């Protein structure tokens, strides 16, 4: 060996261990030494003979990296000499860390040699040595075997039986806990070898499964020995077990979860170990959700997590630490338990998690233990994201709990309540804001009396959330004192973080107030404009300063939507220019805010915003093409190439990061692109091709933008359709034999269609599948079958239907990616709300197709009938409800051309008359009414059982009686059930009044009017009322004063809707159509004519009502 070369290498390595000239030494190693095969024997020589242990260890680490690159370039005699000497020094080296470096080099060489059967005696000899008398020798042999298994080569498969026999013995070694831990880790890698085989050997799988209790014993031993490092390593093994084929894990997964729960709740155990246990349970929910749900472990997990969440925390840190990032990443048992509750509530049905949390509210909130009171409020705050519908149904318990929290004498409980309200408003928005009268005085009082900056901040954030969603007609009485308060808060705080929260609250007040904000608009801009001056100059600004500037942009644009174009006009151009400056800065957050500003202004100015397209769109395209992934490496291309050659997979991964800031920026830029396309219509056409090209790349390659990019693609398609004067929902019904849009428009639709369908069958991200189906459902509903087929080609329609069918059967890739072979599908388990959403959107595709295809849909539905009707029988209320609701909508789509009337009617009547869920019964009533309306066959046999069921529903004493019957019935569900039942009765009476006892039916019907939701059901109700008046039926004429009251309420709501449409913030009332009291102008005219008739017939009775007097004037 060249001694000079060896000396130079050793000196260079020494520079790294000493830290002197580190960068130069690293570059020298990469470029001058590691490219030469002779470096490998030299490094091994230093490993065995180096001057100090740190040098030896570094030489071993570097040698291991070079084995795969240079080993086969070394002559055979040198290779043989190295193998012999390494085995000798591995066992004779006194220092453990050097022994381990030596062992890993042996393992790397073994991986190279074993594949060609060039070192056949290595494994047998090590297995024999591992069974020897000397503890250190056994440990070293097992460590080498473990390192070999860790490097993973399929040539080790021939030794699986020997490994299982050895490690099943050494895992119980009485003299060394380290040997036991290494054996457990080695067994983990053996499991990968067993799985790697073409067919899993059942005997080997059984032997491995039998070793799991021994792994658990090792975990118990290392915990008792306070060996946190080994405890972590064993938990890593358990996490890997979750990914194994169920043949290898047997029935032990449930036992492992229960063991982890015991460890998690044991406060005597080291905190880090308890966190590992909680993280294991989170992993089990991720990878073995079906097993957890099937075993009904959710309640046990929830109770344990609540117990851990109640543990004492550092109160001072909680109240004064403004670092929210640190809070989210904190790994204490308490914080990990809250994260577990958050994950469990999103993965498991509400019956297993959210309902358990709600059950614990009374006891925990009344506890003398302040940490229990804090924990239950935080538990509610995380449960709402995973189970919003269930939490909404429990508002009678949850709202009082949060109010009690706000009134609590302990600041940390107040803080938890504020966090809870913030999260509730995030997920349930206007439903929470309905309680503004209870919340606002308490929150303002907390702001006024806050002694801790975190409480002040969260109180402002909670205020912000409430203000944003307070109803338009409720905000007015608060505006004047609130705006004065917010201006004062802005002036009296120097902290950018706190000012940021206040600015958001001002924006939210504007959002809620709409045109009522105009008197405060100029003053608000005066207060805020100083935060966005010299927008491009950000040098020296803190993150909070930049966030304040960005937040100000976003909220001023929200004000623009509130006060609308005329009031905003004088500020528009200078602020758009400032936003353009923001987009050109180096700050991703400022660029993001600039795009948000542009998106809002496009909403306000629509086609008038077109002049800005030529400057804004190139910046949007530039942003969308930014890399979300970064490879962090200091050096030139030559250095990078050298590093890539020598680095292992782990080192390469460590250099690779995802920039979430860029992802957020791209998401907002994509949303801005949507608004510009929809707002500027034909002015956007020159940019369509480039938009689709860039967005398609994002759907294929992006880390966090795929769903948003796909939504934007369809918004671009929509803008093209609107620009070509295609009116939504005015397309030819049925299968299109040709194209009813021009060729250019069709080409854009086809491109979007291809993108959406491209990987749908193999898509494993549930959120992406939901997005694809939502987009298809929305676009087909608005623009017809051309969205999915054209010119007689139904191949894409068939492909989409196949994917919808697989979702409804539960066999789509996104539903089976974590499927567990030993867990049968169990319909007794309620669906999680995410699963329910997936089924909902799949059914919504069918509903849209039925509307677009009308009678032609019957051919499509024939394949779906068994699955849809099968869902009627599901034990999951969510699945039953959405399936019954969808079937009812399908009846509406097919109308008189429905060949399945008898079958659908029979199935829906069973649900109406027997289902325990009010929501399901209400949905069934809707469908039964429609089927009766459109049936061409004799359906008189269903009248008696259906009317009996409807009377029971409509005659319920009050809403509380219904709520007591079905604990999950929200006010919305109750109102919807009333509307559907009323509409059903009216349709049946219109179809065959002889079969309906009108004397009893009409008073019961009128008792539930006016409707609070489901206003489309007014159509048959109004038709029935008019028909009865035409017949001069005393059943209705005797009710004339009541009819006047009802129509007065209807026109009041219609007037409110029109006022809301004119005065509320642009885009706030997205479902304005649902508030329409009359589905057509024709129906409105007919009602007005009826009112005029009643006024004449009944001595001016209608004119006496001030609302209706204006209507008939």
Swiss-Prot record:
This protein's record includes keyword Transmembrane helix: no
Modified residues (Phosphoserine): 646
InterPro entries tied to this protein: ARM-like (IPR011989), ARM-type_fold (IPR016024), HEAT_type_2 (IPR021133), Importin-beta_N (IPR001494), Importin_beta (IPR040122), TOG (IPR034085)
SUPFAM superfamilies reported for this sequence: ARM repeat
Pfam families: IBN_N (PF03810)
Annotated Importin N-terminal domain residues: 25-92
GO molecular function terms attached to this record: nuclear import signal receptor activity; nuclear localization sequence binding; small GTPase binding
A GO BP annotation: regulation of pseudohyphal growth
GO annotations of cellular component type: cytoplasm; cytoplasmic stress granule; nuclear pore; nucleus
Regions annotated as coiled coil: none
HEAT repeat feature ranges: 3-35, 40-74, 92-115, 120-147, 157-191, 208-244, 252-287, 296-348, 350-384, 388-428, 430-469, 472-513, 515-558, 560-605, 607-680, 683-737, 744-783, 790-856, 859-894, 902-934, 942-991, 999-1030, 1049-1084, 1085-1110
Source organism superkingdom: Eukaryota
Gene3D superfamilies with a match to the protein in the record: Leucine-rich Repeat Variant
Keywords of this entry: Cytoplasm, mRNA transport, Nuclear pore complex, Nucleus, Phosphoprotein, Protein transport, Repeat, Translocation, Transport
Protein localization: Cytoplasm; Nucleus; Nucleus, Nuclear pore complex
Main function: Functions in nuclear protein import as nuclear transport receptor. Serves as receptor for nuclear localization signals (NLS) in cargo substrates. Its predominant cargo substrate seems to be ribosomal proteins. Required for import of the ribosomal assembly factor NMD3. May be involved in nuclear transport of YAP1. Mediates the nuclear import of histones H3 and H4. Mediates docking of the importin/substrate complex to the nuclear pore complex (NPC) through binding to repeat-containing nucleoporins.
Quaternary organization: Interacts with Ran (GSP1); interacts specifically with the GTP-bound form of Ran (GTP-Ran), protecting it from GTP hydrolysis and nucleotide exchange. Interacts with RPL25; this interaction is dissociated by binding to Ran-GTP. Interacts with YAP1. Interacts with histones H3 and H4; via their NLS.
Miscellaneous: Present with 38300 molecules/cell in log phase SD medium.
Family the entry assigns: Belongs to the importin beta family.
Identification of the protein by name: Importin subunit beta-4
Organism: Saccharomyces cerevisiae (strain ATCC 204508 / S288c) (Baker's yeast)
Name of the coding gene: KAP123
